[in-house]
């Protein structure tokens, strides 16, 4: 695993563009809180505003995915150490989907924030770059509920691309948009080890199918 960027998608993605790496800066974070009106903390160590209201949010996760519960607990621990209260909402699979998916909520997503398990296939669907999870108009996913006109224009440019160069340019714009607005945050970038015969080289790596994909048969050569 490796440290992700603000642009969310990992380097193996077609159209990847390097953006600022994520990191922890508690001084900068405290300044952001102050800019938002949170300068004091209560007896429990949580930030409060001028009206005495605690800075808090609910983090939803799927109880059926043990690793996701662990991620949620880690996020809660780190944010509460800093001063933001996190209320964990651990739901069964059906209840989780009903709060986080357009399809299963009948276009009424109600979660504040959630731990999502994005798949390699989902990352590449439609216009790619995890856009189905961000796009509020997507009929199935759309968890981030983004309806921004600039975002939609970028998706259109990606969908209308006729060449790899055109797609890469639009994909770069999307990653810049992710970096600027951060509708979603990657907790880490995963990694894989793919084994192959030493007699061959020039494999094409696919995020979904690994080395065994159609493009490999056009690129592979014997040593």
Feature locations, PLM:
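Sec-exported extracytoplasmic/periplasmic mature domains
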Residues: 1-2, 14, 34-39, 76-84, ...
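Periplasmic binding protein-like
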Residues: 80-135
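Short, well-ordered beta-strand segments
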Residues: 58-60, 114, 188
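Solvent-exposed loop/turn segments at secondary-structure junctions
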Residues: 1-4, 13-16, 63-67, 93-95, ...
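Structural transition elements
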Residues: 3-42, 62-70
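Stable alpha-helical elements in mature extracytoplasmic
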Residues: 1, 5, 25-32, 67-78, ...
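Short, well-ordered beta-strand elements
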Residues: 54-63, 86-89
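Short, solvent-exposed loop/beta-turn-alpha elements that line the ligand-binding surface or hinge
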Residues: 14-31, 41-55, 101-109, 127-160, ...
């Amino acid at each position: 695993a490796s440290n992700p960027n603000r642009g969310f998608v990992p380097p193996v993605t077609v159209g990847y563009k390097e953006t600022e790496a994520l990191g922890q800066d508690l001084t900068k974070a405290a300044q952001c809180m102050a800019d938002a009106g949170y300068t004091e903390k209560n007896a429990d160590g949580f930030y409060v505003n001028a009206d005495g209201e605690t800075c808090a949010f609910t983090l939803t996760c799927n109880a059926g995915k043990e690793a996701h519960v662990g991620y949620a607990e880690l996020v809660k621990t780190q944010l509460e150490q800093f001063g933001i209260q996190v209320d964990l909402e651990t739901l069964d699979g059906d209840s989780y989907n009903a709060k986080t998916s357009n399809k299963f909520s009948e276009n009424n997503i109600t979660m504040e924030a959630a731990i999502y398990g994005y798949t390699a296939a989902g990352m590449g669907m439609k216009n790619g770059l995890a856009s189905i999870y961000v796009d509020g108009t997507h009929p199935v996913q759309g968890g981030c509920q983004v309806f921004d006109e600039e975002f939609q224009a970028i998706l259109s440019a990606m969908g209308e691309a006729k060449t790899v160069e055109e797609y890469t340019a639009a994909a770069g714009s999307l990653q810049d948009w992710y970096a600027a607005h951060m509708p979603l945050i990657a907790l880490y970038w995963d990694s894989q080890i793919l084994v192959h015969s030493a007699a061959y080289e020039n494999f094409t790596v696919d995020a979904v199918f690994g080395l065994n994909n159609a493009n490999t048969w056009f690129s592979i050569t014997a040593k």
